């Protein structure tokens, strides 16, 4: 009981006084709404008795009919007020409470310590789910599910109250049948939910394969793995097809079982006849009570079906309340603790022991002692996992040590106020975290109340002002999600500006330049050196050249400091750990003794090398860009989708389609036949002869029982048949779409609308929508056409006058039902848009929680959330009024139409133009058919979506790629030597046509030799590899392999002779063996070949040391393996391919020194006897290449081997690059 109370409290914990008032009024409205329909039944019993039993010549007949019809109008007016209150109050309070929940929840999440996120590996996705879908669950529960539950429950109670008031005996007899009405829905509802969850799980596996393939499309193309991936995808889809068929069968049984309602109606009809004959009950009263009993049972069933939403809301509410009430061990909101008036910045670690909360069995520090003097720079170096970055995390109190203490100016940091402590530090990380806002706003994350002058000064100090000023919008330039609109060096300089605007006493630099090229590194390093002046600075770096000027260098190994001293002091220890690390990174040139370029000279040479796309564009683009529109064909929108063409894709399933259509048509006929029979049965109660009543009742009872059985069988046929159609169509569409997508040129994937997430969403949603269109919607359409046709035919035959009037008011009925079922639900689009923006913000904040925590920017994020929600909040207030008006109007109009029908029907009877039996038959037929048409009307929205989905599917299937991988006329090379040449090539990326990469570019690469490409970022190094792989075609000029234009070759055959190893190795979810096998041409590869490839890649030893060896799962994108391990598996994959041409794109740049040494050794073995194109920032990795080409502004400015290029001296471009990276001895 207590837990239940706690769960209820968790849902309403965000309500304030206004919300409680709204909910109280909403409760009155929902209960009143539930009472309306039974009250209408009560009035209708009087009308039926008037119509069925009075003397129609009596003058009082029309007066009585008119009086009861007016009573219905009064009820209609009351229902408008009641339904308006219900619709407005619940919609309004739902939005208000959900908005407050999102704000409190995100605030609570951002308050948590970093260790919380380490222990909850899914915390980011959990937060996104809670801010988006969980808040929608609460909002939907309060706005729709709870009022529906209250309304249906009160309708159940009111129905039985009216039943007891009218005819208590019949009501008591009907009461036990409620159980029979509930069983089918409850039993099969659960089964359908279980199957739906399994289908989602099954498709998630296939969706995961598709996502990996599309996000790694360059790797898939490079290794020719398209067919393998499509086969894997197809196999994964088969499971969801089988479950889909089970779902169709279960749905048919579930809906078919509802036919028991007709059998219950038959029994109550029989018992009602006994009441008429033996107790003198009136026919109208009996009929109304039967309707009340069945309506009450149905209402209870609908009410109980809403209980699952209660449990769902309780779970969500408990989960959110748990986070909101959690007080973290390191609480940034806790304002207790000391604040020092003046801080020197002296840092000391005394005998610190530490393990990460997520890995308590792995000690990081056992007895760490470290002292950082005030105003000095201390560098921490060592291998991966030695604990360098942990020092920074502990100093910022992301975690607390298990033992020992950390002091600042002699005071333990756990005695200091957390927020103040972090304000004294500025952090710059390896991967700079920027938020999707302007440059100015990103810098202000460091200091919220900073003036524009302070922002500019910080930018100048970080060497960022000059490039920011070149942007058209200057400091208002939007950086994009995660700063994608900026280069690595630009992002890093903005991150430095953010760190120094707060004037920190302590500066923390964690691998701040490791991911940058030499030129960007020089500029950023200069900014860091400036920022460090006068500050206590702790530096972590892999590139030892960046920390050689540190006051103290500490070598960290296995969580302890094993060496301390300056650069020169540590180098004196010939066998020292620092010396060995330096040797690994040493640029081996015999002339190093003679390289003594003055710092200023090296700097000026570097500036000469600086690539300025802006200046280059103005001078070169005029003759190229004007031709661009014709060179990048736009995807034309598909023609109006052809339903016939869609059906042709379903041709193999035509037999099942026939069964489905037949079942739908037969079930469509059930409702009008049932309504007609019910109307006829009411008139039977008014017969004078008891024998006639008995005889006719027996016939109708048997008819109702027959309809129950007929409903069961026709639904099974309908739903299984259409499920079979839909499932196989979905599978076929997904296979064809993925197959077609994997023929598209890489440029297609570069567009924002074709990201891996967007494509996978289309594969999932578009195919599902088409299945829904062909399966569910088509069956409903056939069913509706059948019902409407039979209804109109029966009505016109019986009484054309009354039928025409009933037909004329049907649109009103349909619109009212449609409003209740569709429009009210679709009004939340703006709210959902607001949720999307909230989710985006939450995802960005939580995935960058360390940056948020380091800069104490929680309040800033909450303010951004309020801004994001402001628009949807205002829209919601208007929508609440609209919801109330629409709900009230639709309910009252339905009642008014009933009043009109009764009045007009009574008039026709009084005038002798229609019999009472005919009136009852037509009235009930059209009343029920209005609901059927409205039900079909709810699919109009789905038809539009389905039409869009069909267009989307055919847009993919009909699109012609600009780079055909399976050109039947293409030359198929049997053997490739590997001689490569670029002749007068012009190129710009299609997504950035105004940025010219190459103009008149030429280079020759000898076969069997290794050629290195070096140069600053943006000079076009990686573009060379993309053009060789023919990911793109040049705008002008020719790329040749072995003297043949690669555009004339069969592309997939050509790629079989080329292997690519990238900076970030792409592994797929699967075993190590499967990942290596992607390098093979077929699926049948000997184990010995796999092992030989692994040995050649220096991977065999570490693979065999794993518990499952080659059967070890790599995890999604290889997350279970380290960077060096992943890279060696990628090399083994390339070895297995036995390529003639090897392309190495920054293959070791992201590795630490030890991993780099092992991987570099494997690469050098692989390069022997092959044409190799090597791109590298670290020049130590390419000094042994036969040829080194230096690129600048999209042109080769120098070419030769390592020694010959160095011989050119300080004026040489290569010499300048080496100077930037040299380590002095």
From Swiss-Prot:
GO molecular function terms attached to this record: ABC-type transporter activity; ATP binding; ATP hydrolysis activity
Glycosylation positions in this chain? 530, 754, 960, 1000, 1201
Indicate the transmembrane segments per the record.
Answer: 23-43, 70-90, 146-168, 172-194, 252-272, 284-304, 657-677, 699-719, 780-800, 804-824, 880-900, 919-939
The ABC transmembrane type-1 domain sits at: 23-312, 657-945
- Tell me which Gene3D superfamilies the record gives: ABC transporter type 1, transmembrane domain (1.20.1560.10), P-loop containing nucleotide triphosphate hydrolases (3.40.50.300)
Keyword field contains Transferase: no
**What subcellular compartments does it reside in?**
Membrane
**Principal cellular location given in the protein's record:** membrane
Origin: domain of life:
Eukaryota
Q: What is this protein called?
A: ABC transporter B family member 18
| Lineage, highest ranks first | Eukaryota, Viridiplantae, Streptophyta, Embryophyta, Tracheophyta
């Amino acid at each position: 009981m207590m837990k239940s109370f706690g769960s209820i409290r968790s849902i309403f914990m965000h309500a304030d006084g206004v919300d409680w008032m709204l909910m109280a009024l909403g409760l009155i409205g929902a209960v009143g709404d539930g009472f309306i329909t039974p009250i209408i039944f009560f009035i209708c019993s009087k009308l039926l008795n008037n119509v069925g039993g009075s003397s129609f010549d009596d003058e009082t007949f029309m007066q009585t009919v008119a009086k009861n019809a007016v009573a219905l109008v009064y009820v209609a007016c009351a229902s408008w007020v009641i339904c308006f209150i219900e619709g407005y109050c619940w919609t309004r309070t739902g939005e208000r409470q959900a908005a407050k929940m999102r704000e409190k929840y995100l605030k609570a999440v951002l308050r948590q310590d970093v260790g919380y996120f380490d222990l909850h590996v899914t915390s980011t996705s959990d937060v996104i789910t809670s801010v988006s879908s969980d808040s929608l669950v609460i909002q939907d529960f309060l706005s729709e599910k709870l009022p529906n539950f209250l309304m249906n429950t009160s309708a159940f109670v009111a129905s039985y109250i009216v039943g007891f008031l009218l005819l208590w005996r019949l009501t008591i007899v009907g009461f036990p049948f409620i159980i029979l009405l509930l069983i089918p829905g409850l039993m099969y509802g659960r089964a359908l939910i279980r199957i739906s969850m399994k289908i989602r799980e099954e498709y998630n596996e296939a969706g995961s394969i598709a996502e990996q393939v599309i996000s790694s499309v360059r790797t898939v193309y490079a290794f020719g793995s398209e067919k393998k991936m499509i086969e894997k995808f197809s196999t994964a889809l088969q499971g969801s097809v089988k479950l889909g068929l089970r779902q169709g069968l279960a749905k048919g049984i579930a809906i078919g079982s509802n036919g028991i309602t007709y059998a219950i109606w038959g029994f109550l009809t029989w018992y009602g006849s006994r009441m008429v004959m033996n107790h003198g009950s009136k026919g109208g009263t009996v009929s109304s009570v039967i309707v009340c009993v069945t309506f009450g049972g149905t209402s209870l069933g609908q009410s109980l079906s809403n209980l699952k939403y209660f449990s769902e809301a309780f779970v969500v509410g408990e989960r959110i309340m748990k986070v909101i009430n959690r007080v973290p061990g390191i609480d940034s909101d806790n304002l207790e603790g000391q604040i020092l008036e003046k801080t020197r910045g002296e840092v000391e670690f005394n005998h610190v022991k530490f393990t990460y909360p997520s890995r308590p069995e792995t000690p990081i520090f056992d007895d760490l002692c470290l002292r950082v003097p005030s105003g000095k720079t201390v560098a921490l170096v060592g291998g991966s996992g030695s604990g360098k970055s942990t020092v920074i995390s502990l100093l910022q109190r992301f975690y607390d040590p298990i033992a020992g203490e950390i002091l600042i100016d002699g005071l333990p940091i756990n005695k200091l106020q957390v927020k103040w402590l972090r304000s004294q530090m500025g952090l710059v990380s390896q991967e700079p975290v920027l938020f999707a806002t302007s440059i100015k706003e990103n810098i202000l994350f460091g200091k919220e109340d900073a003036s524009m002058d302070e922002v500019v000064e910080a930018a100048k100090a970080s060497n960022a002002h000059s490039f920011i000023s070149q942007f058209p919008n200057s400091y208002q330039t939007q950086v994009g999600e995660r700063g994608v609109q900026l280069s690595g060096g630009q992002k890093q300089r903005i991150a430095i500006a953010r760190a120094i605007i707060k004037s920190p006493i302590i500066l923390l630099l964690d691998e701040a330049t490791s991911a940058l090229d030499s030129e960007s590194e020089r500029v950023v390093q200069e900014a860091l050196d400036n920022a460090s002046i006068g500050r206590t600075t702790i530096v972590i770096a892999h590139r030892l050249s960046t920390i050689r000027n540190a006051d103290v260098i500490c070598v960290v190994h296995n969580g302890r400091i094993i060496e301390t001293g300056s650069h020169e002091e540590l180098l004196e220890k010939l066998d020292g750990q620092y010396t060995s690390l330096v040797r690994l990174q040493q640029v081996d040139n015999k002339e190093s003794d003679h390289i003594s370029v003055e710092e200023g000279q090296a700097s000026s040479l570097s500036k000469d090398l600086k690539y300025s796309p802006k200046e280059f564009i103005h001078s070169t683009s005029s003759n190229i860009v004007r031709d661009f529109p014709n060179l990048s064909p736009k995807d034309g929108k598909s023609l109006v989708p052809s339903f016939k063409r869609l059906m042709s894709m379903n041709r193999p399933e035509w037999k099942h389609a026939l069964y489905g259509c037949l079942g739908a048509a037969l079930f469509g006929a059930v409702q009008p036949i049932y309504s007609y029979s019910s109307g006829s049965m009411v008139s039977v109660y008014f017969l004078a002869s008891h024998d006639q009543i008995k005889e006719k009742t027996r016939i109708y009872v048997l008819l109702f029982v027959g309809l129950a059985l007929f409903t069961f069988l026709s639904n099974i046929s309908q739903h299984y048949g259409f499920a079979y159609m839909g499932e196989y169509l979905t599978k076929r569409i997904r296979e064809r779409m993925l197959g077609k997508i994997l023929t598209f040129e890489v440029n297609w994937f570069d567009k924002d609308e074709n990201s891996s997430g967007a494509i996978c969403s289309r594969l999932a949603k578009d195919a599902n929508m088409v299945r829904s269109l062909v399966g569910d919607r088509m069956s409903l359409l056939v069913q509706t056409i059948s019902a409407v046709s039979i209804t109109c035919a029966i009505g016109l035959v019986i009484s054309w006058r009354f039928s025409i009037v009933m037909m004329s008011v049907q649109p009103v009925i349909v619109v009212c039902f449609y409003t209740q079922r569709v429009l009210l639900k679709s009004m939340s689009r703006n709210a959902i848009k607001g949720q999307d923006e909230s989710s985006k913000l939450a995802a960005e904040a939580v995935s960058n929680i360390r940056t948020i925590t380091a800069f104490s920017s929680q309040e800033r994020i909450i303010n951004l959330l309020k801004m994001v929600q402001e628009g949807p909040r205002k829209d919601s207030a208007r929508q609440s009024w609209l919801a109330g008006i629409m709900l009230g109007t639709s309910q009252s109009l339905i009642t008014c139409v009933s009043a009109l029908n009764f009045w007009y029907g009574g008039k026709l009877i009084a005038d002798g133009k229609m019999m009472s039996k005919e009136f009852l038959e037509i009235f009930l037929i059209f009343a029920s058919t209005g609901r059927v048409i409205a039900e079909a009307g709810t699919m109009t929205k789905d038809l539009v979506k389905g039409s869009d989905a069909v267009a989307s599917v055919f847009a993919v299937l009909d699109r012609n790629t600009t780079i055909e991988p399976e050109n039947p006329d293409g030359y198929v090379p049997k053997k490739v030597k590997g001689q490569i040449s670029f002749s007068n090539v012009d190129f710009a990326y299609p997504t950035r046509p105004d940025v010219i990469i190459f103009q008149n570019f030429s280079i020759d690469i000898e076969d069997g030799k290794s050629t290195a490409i070096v140069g600053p970022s943006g000079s076009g190094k990686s573009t060379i590899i993309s053009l060789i792989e023919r990911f793109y075609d040049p705008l002008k000029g020719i790329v040749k392999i072995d003297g043949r234009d690669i555009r004339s070759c069969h592309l997939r055959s050509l790629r079989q002779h080329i292997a690519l190893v990238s900076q970030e190795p792409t592994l797929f979810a699967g075993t190590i063996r499967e990942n290596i096998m992607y390098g093979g041409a077929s699926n049948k590869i000997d184990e010995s070949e796999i092992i030989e490839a692994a040995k050649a890649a220096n991977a065999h030893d570490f693979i065999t040391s794993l518990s499952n060896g080659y059967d070890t799962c790599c995890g999604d994108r290889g997350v279970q393996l380290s960077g060096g391990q992943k890279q060696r598996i990628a090399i083994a994959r390339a070895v297995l391919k036995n390529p003639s041409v090897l392309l190495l794109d920054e293959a070791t740049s992201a590795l630490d020194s030890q991993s780099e040494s092992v991987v570099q050794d494997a690469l050098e073995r692989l390069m022997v006897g092959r044409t190799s194109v090597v791109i590298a920032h670290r020049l130590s990795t390419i000094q042994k290449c036969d040829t080194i080409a230096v690129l600048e502004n999209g042109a080769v400015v120098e070419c030769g081997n390592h020694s010959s290029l160095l011989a050119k001296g300080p004026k040489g471009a290569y010499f300048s690059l080496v100077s930037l990276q040299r380590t002095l001895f």
